[in-house]
Amino acid sequence: MNTRVSESSFKRLIQLVGCVLIIVLSNSRLSNAQSIEFPTCAKSEVLNTEIHLYVDESVLAEYSKAFVASKIATWESYSNLVLKNSCIPMTRKVTKVTYTPEIDSLWFQDLGAAERLLKLSMEEPIKEITEDGSPVFSGVVFSNYHSAFESRYCGVASQVSRFFSLAINCPDSTMEHEIGHLSGANHDYKKVLKDHESIDHFIAGSYPKAPAYSFGATCSERGTVMSYERDIIPVYSSPEIRVNGQQCGDNAHHNNARVLREFANTQLKLINSNKN
């Protein structure tokens, strides 16, 4: 049987933790004002995206529901900070959290199987869009990615749907990293070249074909959210962002902020066309 977190208490906790995180991150941003330069964002229509999370009930053997809720609130706030810093007209909001005993940690190894099994076990359908056509990203949350059949990855994103998985003990940037993949963003060159013989080989094998500018970046020994660096800046790669005077991207190869903006614009056009 599936259990739901009390909606009112969850929302209050999300608001509280979110406010605290925003204050902390804002102060951090101000303290680094001389070393990190963010662009001035132009006003535009905003795409509001929803996130539905399905939590392995065995998580509660290690963590309380309050702790899990605080982690989810942190992920949400981090995502919105990344989008804001990168001038991407989009928001994230976790609107549904479902605890279920149906999830098995072995699912972490095969996201496609996890998605199919979860859809079969849930009483309600798993949505990919809201009633007005806005995107819904669905994620399976595990307790520990190390114990999930010794997974090499802290999070995984589907190549064919808006489905992802991650663990409670993953870095706070992981959720936005995976949703970035679901929106068309790719890793930095260093990570891509560990798994492919060349960037051209990766692009040729991707479907839909990855734009040449869809890669993450490193700058001044730090990485953007799609990189695998230990020190992550809460931004998508963009030539408009600088760290210690060094650009965190370029127009030709490392501009995931553009990728996300194009995703937002495409979705908004679909939503608006359905209204007419």
Protein language model regions, located:
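Short amphipathic alpha-helical segments with coiled-coil-like heptad repeat character
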Residues: N2-R4, I88-P89
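General helical secondary-structure elements
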Residues: E7-S8, L25, G112, A257
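Bacterial N-terminal signal peptides
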Residues: L16-L25
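Boundary at the C-terminal end of the N-terminal hydrophobic targeting segment
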Residues: S31-S35
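Extracellular (secreted or membrane-anchored) zinc-dependent metallopeptidases
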Residues: I36-N276
